[in-house]
Design a protein with these regions (language model features):
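Polysaccharide-binding surfaces and accessory modules of carbohydrate-active proteins
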Residues: 1-147
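Residues that flank catalytic or metal-binding motifs in active/ligand-binding sites
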Residues: 21, 50, 180-182, 216, ...
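Beta-strand-rich recognition/accessory modules
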Residues: 30, 46, 70-72, 103-216
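Intrinsically disordered, low-complexity acidic/polar segments
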Residues: 34, 61-65, 76, 190-193, ...
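Short alpha-helical segments and helix-capping/turn motifs at coil-helix boundaries
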Residues: 36-39, 52-53, 163-168, 204-205, ...
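Residues within well-ordered beta-strands of beta-sheet-rich folds
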Residues: 42, 51-57, 180-182, 219-221, ...
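Short, charged/polar micro-motifs that form catalytic or ligand-binding hotspots
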Residues: 44, 210, 225-228
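Aromatic-lined carbohydrate-binding/catalytic grooves of carbohydrate-active enzymes
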Residues: 216-276
Length: 276
């Protein structure tokens, strides 16, 4: 697509925001009867990462369900991790269907959601890549390797949809005069685990945690023991145990202990649920 664009413009400005002080570089590509492609790069003093986003802009309006703020060229051969046990962190989109975080050999192709890390387990050096804005898009990370230790494809894309996101339809299209991807985090770290901590702080800079000045809720979830065997009678037994053994032994918060009824609660009647 970039080959159809004939004009390029690069701008820069000093910035100061929640991430610190730095520079924003903007690359704008334009062409006749084409929406402008605007990519911004945010670089901050003292940070081992940069942020970037990409946008399509047209006064007549644009719509898309797919953007790639970071993507390698098709013939990429990257061995930045060096020799060793090179691996990929796979992050699930949610916690449904018993899905887990896991580490995979850097071979073939893998998909992660919202964030991933490609790292050398022997040296701990690695790349962390992920979206730090989560209000509009579902994003994915695609990593491929056709040779041990070599990254042949690395991209973060918006519009992730499929079994991993529990979707059966394509991602919805985002419309407007300007459609922008989420800001994307990319950094190389001596220890990829420190990079993941930095990624978390970057997310919290954009969307700070909500304040909570009260106690920590104390409770029990039924799945750990009962799984699908949850029943009205079992819930009452647990409630009695809480009252007789926990609440009077300081296993509580302000005198309250919660019961989280997981899979199986729908088998109870409305009357039983109201009684509980």
């Amino acid at each position: 697509v970039s080959g159809t664009y004939t004009e390029y413009e690069i701008g820069q400005e000093e910035i100061t925001d929640g991430f610190g002080t730095g520079m924003c570089f903007t690359v704008t590509r334009s062409g006749e009867n084409l929406p402008s492609v605007i990519q911004r790069f945010f670089l901050y003093e003292g940070k081992d990462y940069f942020l970037t986003d990409v946008a399509l802009s047209d006064e007549k309006g644009v719509e898309t369900n797919y953007l790639r703020p970071i993507s390698t060229e098709p013939d990429t051969r990257c061995d930045i991790l060096g020799k060793g046990d090179n691996r990929v962190l796979i992050v699930p989109f949610d916690n449904d269907k018993w899905v887990r975080y896991r580490s995979s050999d850097l071979r073939g192709g893998v998909n992660s959601f919202e964030v991933s890390a490609v790292y050398n387990a022997d040296t701990r050096r690695g790349i962390v890549i992920g979206s730090v804005e989560h209000d509009t898009w579902k994003s994915g990370v695609r990593i491929e390797s056709d040779e041990p230790g070599i990254i042949s494809r690395l991209e973060l894309y918006t519009g992730a949809s499929g079994e991993g996101t529990r979707d059966v339809l394509p991602h919805g299209k985002v419309k407007g005069k300007t459609v922008r991807s989420p800001k994307t985090f990319f950094g190389y770290f001596e220890d990829w685990r420190d990079g993941m901590e930095e990624f978390g702080r970057a997310c919290a800079t954009i969307a700070p945690p909500l304040p909570w000045n009260l106690g920590t809720p104390f409770g029990w979830n039924s799945w750990a023991k009962m799984e699908f065997r949850l029943s009205y009678e079992k819930v009452l037994e647990v409630s009695d145990f809480f009252k007789e053994n926990l609440q009077n032994n300081n296993f509580e918060n302000n005198g309250i202990v919660y019961i989280g009824m997981d899979a199986g609660w729908a088998k109870m009647s409305d009357e039983q649920l109201a009684d509980i």
